[in-house]
Amino acid sequence: MGKYFGTDGVRGIANSELTPELAFKIGRFGGYVLTKDKERPKVLIGRDTRISGHMLEGALVAGLLSIGAEVMRLGVISTPGVAYLTKALGAQAGVMISASHNPVQDNGIKFFGPDGFKLSDEQELEIEALLDSEQDTLPRPIGKDLGQVNDYFEGGQKYLQYLKQTVDEDFSGIHVALDCAHGATSALATHLFADLDADVSTMGASPNGLNINDGVGSTHPEALAAFVKEKGADVGLAFDGDGDRLIAVDENGQIVDGDQIMYICAKYLNEQGRLKHQTVVSTVMSNLGFYKALEAQGIKSVQTAVGDRYVVEEMKKNGYNLGGEQSGHIIFLDYNTTGDGLLTALQLVNIMKVTKKPLSELAGEMKKYPQKLVNVKVTDKQEAIANEEVQRVIREVEEEMAGNGRILVRPSGTEPLVRVMAEAPTNELCDQYVERIAAVIRERFGA
């Protein structure tokens, strides 16, 4: 990753790291890179509910107008909503202002190309080079050649109309509990499920600019689990701040994670003959129980590095149509170009309706292996992982597991940590395996 762009756009503390000055430049230079071949290019901008969203939007808009772009403001909308509308409205680029599941003080900016996909590494590097250049030599249109800004707040409704076409059934007779994380889906989700005749109970849908992700949403599903039981709902659906993730809760208040949701959708699509190449794409963090459950259904799997962008890359490259992460980013490439919480929620409830099975039964077919993750602070993460003694103890543990468990040792992408993860039939074995490896890393490379 570059100096500004991480795995999911530019992120930082709003007004401290991600300043309006930087946002102006990102709008100007990013807009130029994405639209330089087009006269009067059209660029869409959406944002989540953070207090800093207005400030950054104003700066971004100014940067885009300064290179002659026509800007359409979508207002508060989910990240996948921006991705869909960028392509559907024939825009040259889309921009989302959000820091997803991060706390309120953070914010971020991510771009989509005209095809609705996130930018390539090459495009990001081109924008970074302009951000780092000492002089701004880009064109400065004047008079009638300057860009203009218009509001298109109906964009959210256009996106919801599209989503409704992805399911055949209405949801009458199903009681759905929603947790919108006080974020981008706060207005969208209730409308969507009510339009499909579900009985809807909603929490986490009163954004005030400061409460996004605060004890609610897909990173705090325990709040929704209690709400489901209180309301007697059939299913709970928790989104994150920008609406690109879904974590579900069954009728008993049990959490159903991204692996389980992927398994349920993969099995259903496969039975319908709609799972391309009978394959699902996941990351190395997916649970061993996920792979074993897929195998039992005759479904193949492909693994990528952690990050939904790598899942999407693999799907595009080899023509797969279902992939995702344990964290709840699920990608249905037949319908959208990025992880989409609302879309995933629709597919999941549709499967419940068609199969007439409760979520506990659908999710129960996948037996999750106990998982233990330990972070070890180190002086040199790459050296720690490559170390011969560390590799020897990893091999030793893997031999003992004999295929009935899994070890994953990887560096953190952002911190001086090595993450040691084990999956095994019991919690005790998980603890033993992780500690044996972590102890060797600590002894030799502990910070």
Curated annotation (Swiss-Prot):
What does its PTM field state? Activated by phosphorylation.
Q: Would the keyword rRNA processing be found if you checked this record's keyword annotation? A: no
What EC class is this? Answer: isomerase
Top-rank taxon, per record? Bacteria
Q: What keywords would UniProt list here?
A: Isomerase, Magnesium, Metal-binding, Phosphoprotein
Entry cofactor note text?
Answer: Binds 1 Mg(2+) ion per subunit.
* Keyword Metal-binding listed: yes
Q: Check the record and name the Pfam families matching this protein.
A: PGM_PMM_I (PF02878), PGM_PMM_II (PF02879), PGM_PMM_III (PF02880), PGM_PMM_IV (PF00408)
Question: Active site annotated at which positions?
Answer: 100
Q: Which cofactor does it need?
A: Mg(2+)
Query: What's in the GO CC field?
Result: cytosol
- State one molecular function term (GO): magnesium ion binding
Q: According to the UniProt entry, what is the EC number of this protein?
A: 5.4.2.10
GO biological process terms held by the UniProt record: carbohydrate metabolic process; peptidoglycan biosynthetic process; UDP-N-acetylglucosamine biosynthetic process
Which reaction(s) does the protein catalyse, per the Swiss-Prot or TrEMBL entry? Answer: alpha-D-glucosamine 1-phosphate = D-glucosamine 6-phosphate
Annotated Mg(2+) binding lies at 100, 240, 242, 244
Residue positions, PTM Phosphoserine? 100
Q: Tell me, in a sentence or two, what this protein's role is.
A: Catalyzes the conversion of glucosamine-6-phosphate to glucosamine-1-phosphate.
Q: Which family does it belong to?
A: Belongs to the phosphohexose mutase family.
Q: What is this protein called?
A: Phosphoglucosamine mutase
Corresponding gene?
glmM
